[in-house]
Regions:
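Non-catalytic, polymerase-adjacent accessory regions of viral genome-replication enzymes
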Residues: 1-75
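Reverse-transcriptase-like RNA-dependent polymerase core
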Residues: 50, 80-104, 117-126, 156-160, ...
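Short beta-strand-to-loop capping motifs
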Residues: 68, 112, 289-293
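Conserved polymerase palm-domain catalytic core
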Residues: 92, 136-137, 149-316, 323, ...
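A conserved non-catalytic segment of reverse transcriptases
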Residues: 211, 217-220, 312-388, 392-395, ...
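Non-catalytic, peripheral interaction segments enriched in hydrophobic/basic residues
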Residues: 382, 391-450
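Extended C-terminal regions of large enzymes
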Residues: 432, 436-550
Length: 551
C-alpha cells in the first residue's frame, strides 16, 4: 500500500496512525513512509515528545542541546530535519556507562539531538505498523503496557487452570547473552520487511543508524552488531527482532492456527494432538515460559537453545536459563517472585482447598539494594544547611518511596513496605539527631499535619521526621500508605493508542470509569499556524519554541 500524506494537524496525524494500525493488522505492507516522517506535523510532535525529557538537556558528540534547535525559526528547523533525513548520515553516539544493580556497568549511547528528533519522527510512523503485528503477551517498551501487566497475566494463567492436572507450575526462565549487543543487522532488516515496512529508503536509514558507531574516550568504534542502547528507535527494533520468537512459541504451543471459534476449544485440540500447552511472557529481553511438567520444561529449554542459535543468531546463557518449580522456589521476573501456593486459609474450614494459585511477591534481594540507595538519599538531607534545600531533598526522597511502593503494589507486599519504612525511619533518626541534637524528638509530627502531600497523608496519625518552614511541616512519607492492589482480571489486550476503542479502554482503566476533568487540546491547530504566519508578515519571526508553546 503506497501512502499519500495528507495531514496538517496533530489530530489528523493520530487518524493517520490509526489507519496504519488497522491496515497493518490486516496484513498490508507499506511504501511511501518517508514522506509521512518528514511532514511538518510529525516533526512538531517529535520535538514536543522529546523536549520534556531530561535527556533533551544532554548533548551528543556535536555538543548541541535541544535549546539550540528550539531557538531556530520553525522554517529553518523543518528544512534542516527534512534535508538531513533525505540524505541521512547519522553521527556516532557518545558512549557513557551507568551502574547496574549488580555493580557492573551498562554501556549507554547518547545520540545527537538532531538524530534523536529524526528517530522520534520515524518511531511515530513505524510504531503503529509494528504494534499491530506484535505478540499479545510481550510487554516491554510498548505503549499502555508495564511490568505489572506481565506479572498479572502470569498469575492469571496459573489461576485459570487451578483445578486441572495440567496446571502450569513449571517454568523456563530465559536469559539471552548480550541480547541487544548481538542483534544481527541483516536479519533485523529482513524482519522489518516481513512486518510490513517495504519503503527501502526507510530501511536504508535504519541500516545507517545501526552502523553509526560510537565515541568512547575520544576513540571511534564501529558497530557491526547490535542496536544502540539509548537510541529512541532501539526498543522498537529490539521488539521487532524478538517478535518471531514470541510467535514461534505462541503458534506452536499456545494458539496453534486458531482453528476453533473459542480459545478453550483450541487448547483442547492442542492437547488431543499430544502437545502440552506452554505460555510465553516477555518483557524486553527477559522472558518466562510456563508449562505443566518438568520434562516439558527441560525439552523446551533444549529446543529454544537451538532455535536462538540457528534462527535468531543469539545465544542462551545455560548458566542463567533456569528450569524452576513454582511450588518450591518461584520464578524471579522483573523484580518479583511468582510462586504457586495454596490459598490462604479462612476462618471457615469448609472453604479450605488444596488447589494452587499464583502469588506474586517482591524480590527482596533486589529491593534491599534499592533501599540502600534510598537510604543514601535520606542521608543527603543532613548535608544541607538551608531549610529550603532540605525540603527539596525530602520531596525527592518521597518521590522515590512512592515510586517503589507503586511498583510493588500488584504483589503481596506489606512486609516489603514495612522494610522500606523501617530502614528509612532509622536512617532519618540518625540524620535528625545530627541536625537537631536537642530537639529531634519534637521534629516528629503526625503525617496528617504535614503540608506536603496532604491528600496522601490525610487521616494518618503515624509520626514521621519533618522540618518546619514558615510554620509549615515538610516530612518524609511512608510506603505503607500505598495499599497493595491485586487485579484479578487479565490484561486487556485491546488497549492500544491506535484505535478509538483502545484509547477509551485505557482511559477507563486509568480513571476507573470516572470522567476526566478536562481534555488536552491539539498541540498544533490551524489557529496556531495562522498566528505564526501573521507574525512573520509583521516583520519578525517566532522561533520554534514559541510556535510549539501556542496551545
Amino acid at each position: 500500500m503506497h501512502l499519500s500524506v495528507r495531514f496538517s494537524t496533530e489530530k489528523e496525524l493520530k487518524q493517520f496512525q490509526d489507519l496504519l494500525y488497522e491496515k497493518s493488522g490486516q496484513g498490508v505492507s507499506f511504501t511511501g513512509l518517508l514522506e509521512a516522517m518528514v511532514s511538518e506535523v510529525t516533526i512538531v510532535t517529535a520535538v514536543h515528545n522529546i523536549k520534556p525529557n531530561k535527556g533533551s538537556k544532554t548533548a551528543g558528540v556535536d555538543r548541541m542541546k535541544m535549546d539550540k534547535y528550539l531557538q531556530m525559526p520553525k522554517e529553518e528547523l523543518f528544512q534542516l530535519i527534512q534535508s538531513n533525513i533525505s540524505n541521512y548520515k547519522p553521527k556516532p553516539a557518545k558512549r557513557k556507562y551507568i551502574e547496574k544493580a549488580n555493580g557492573k556497568k551498562r554501556p549507554l549511547g547518547i545520540p545527537t539531538v538532531l538524530d534523536r528528533i529524526i528517530q522520534e519522527c520515524m518511531r511515530l510512523i513505524l510504531e503503529p505498523i509494528c504494534e499491530a503485528r506484535f505478540y499479545p503477551h510481550s510487554y516491554g517498551f510498548r505503549p499502555y503496557r508495564a511490568q505489572k501487566h506481565a506479572i498479572r497475566d502470569i498469575v492469571n494463567v496459573i489461576n485459570a487452570s487451578v483445578k486441572s492436572k495440567d496446571q502450569p507450575v513449571w517454568a523456563v526462565e530465559g536469559d539471552i547473552k548480550g541480547c541487544f549487543d548481538n542483534i544481527n543487522h541483516r536479519l533485523l532488516l529482513k524482519k522489518l520487511w516481513r512486518i510490513g515496512i517495504h519503503d527501502k529508503r526507510v530501511l536504508k536509514i535504519i541500516s545507517q543508524m545501526l552502523k553509526a558507531g560510537y565515541i568512547d574516550q575520544d576513540l571511534y568504534h564501529a558497530t557491526e552488531m547490535g542496536t544502540p542502547q539509548g537510541g529512541i528507535l532501539s526498543p522498537l527494533l529490539s521488539n521487532v527482532y524478538l517478535n518471531d520468537f514470541d510467535w514461534y512459541v505462541g503458534r506452536c504451543y499456545m494458539e496453534p492456527h486458531r482453528q476453533c471459534k473459542h480459545k478453550c476449544n483450541d487448547t483442547r485440540r492442542l492437547k488431543w494432538s499430544g502437545i502440552t500447552p506452554k505460555y510465553n511472557f516477555r518483557y524486553a529481553d527477559d522472558w518466562v515460559i510456563l508449562t505443566s511438567t518438568e520434562q516439558e520444561a527441560f525439552r523446551m529449554k533444549h529446543e529454544l537453545t537451538k532455535y536462538f542459535k540457528h534462527r535468531m543468531k543469539l545465544e542462551l546463557s545455560q548458566e542463567k536459563t533456569y528450569v524452576t518449580d513454582l511450588r518450591k522456589n518461584g520464578i524471579h521476573f522483573l523484580g518479583y517472585i511468582v510462586k504457586a501456593e495454596r490459598k490462604r486459609k479462612t476462618p471457615d474450614p469448609a472453604t479450605w482447598s488444596d488447589n494452587l494459585v499464583g502469588k506474586p511477591f517482591p524480590d527482596m534481594e533486589r529491593l534491599t539494594k534499592k533501599i540502600h540507595t534510598l537510604q543514601k538519599e535520606v542521608r543527603k538531607i543532613g548535608l544541607y544547611t538551608q531549610s529550603n534545600t532540605q525540603a527539596a531533598q525530602i520531596q525527592y526522597v518521597n518521590s522515590v518511596i512512592m515510586g517503589l511502593a507503586q511498583y510493588l503494589q500488584p504483589s503481596i507486599c506489606s512486609h516489603a513496605y514495612h522494610a522500606i519504612d523501617r530502614r528509612v525511619n532509622n536512617t532519618a533518626l540518625a540524620v535528625w539527631k545530627n541536625l537537631f541534637p536537642k530537639q529531634y524528638n519534637q521534629m516528629q509530627v503526625p503525617l496528617k499535619e504535614l503540608s506536603n502531600l496532604p491528600h496522601r497523608h490525610e487521616g494518618y496519625d503515624s509520626k514521621t521526621f519533618a522540618i518546619q518552614i514558615d510554620g509549615k511541616w515538610f516530612g518524609i512519607t511512608y510506603a505503607f500508605i500505598t495499599h497493595s492492589r491485586y487485579e484479578s482480571k487479565p490484561f486487556d489486550q485491546k488497549m492500544t493508542p491506535y484505535t478509538e476503542d483502545g484509547r477509551r479502554r485505557y482511559v477507563n482503566y486509568r480513571t476507573k470509569h470516572k470522567p476526566l476533568p478536562c481534555d488536552r487540546p491539539s498541540i498544533n491547530t490551524p489557529e496556531d499556524i495562522a498566528l505564526s504566519i501573521y507574525a512573520s508578515g509583521k516583520g519578525w519571526k517566532a522561533n520554534f519554541e514559541y510556535f510549539m508553546n501556542r496551545e
